[in-house]
């Protein structure tokens, strides 16, 4: 990972605790947005926006794009790497 990429992704995550919460939720198992929303106490519309941002950054992936109703998401290796990095840098 290059330094510029590192900083932009770390900044993306550091600006939103909810994005970090989504990644943490997906660490345990692959989930649909509704289940992630329950885990992080947010509605599925917001979760879908977080997932789009995380997907664009290649931190999560949709496992079944063709299914319009029950899309399962998974954290990528890149997502795990940056989640760990952000947690280490920003833990009190």
Task: Name the predicted role of every residue range.
Residues 1-21:
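Short alpha-helical segments that sit at the start of domains
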Residues 67-86:
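Basic, amphipathic "hinge/linker" alpha-helix immediately C-terminal to the N-terminal HTH DNA-binding motif
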Residues 1-5, 80-92:
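Amphipathic alpha-helical dimerization/coiled-coil segments
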Residues 42-56:
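Short amphipathic alpha-helical interaction segments
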Residues 17, 28-32:
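Short capping segments at the starts of secondary-structure elements
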Residues 57-68:
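Beta-hairpin "wing" of winged helix-turn-helix
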Residues 35-39:
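A short acidic, leucine-rich amphipathic alpha-helix
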Residues 20-24, 81:
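Pre-recognition alpha-helix immediately N-terminal to the DNA-recognition helix
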């Amino acid at each position: 990972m290059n330094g510029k990429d590192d900083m932009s992704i770390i900044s993306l995550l550091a600006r939103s605790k909810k994005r970090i919460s989504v990644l943490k939720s997906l660490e345990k198992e692959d989930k649909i947005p509704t289940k992630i929303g329950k885990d992080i106490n947010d509605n599925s519309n917001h979760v879908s926006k977080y997932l789009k941002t995380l997907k664009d950054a290649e931190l999560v992936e949709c496992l079944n794009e063709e299914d319009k109703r029950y899309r399962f998401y998974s954290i990528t290796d890149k997502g795990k790497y940056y989640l760990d990095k952000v947690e280490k840098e920003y833990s009190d």
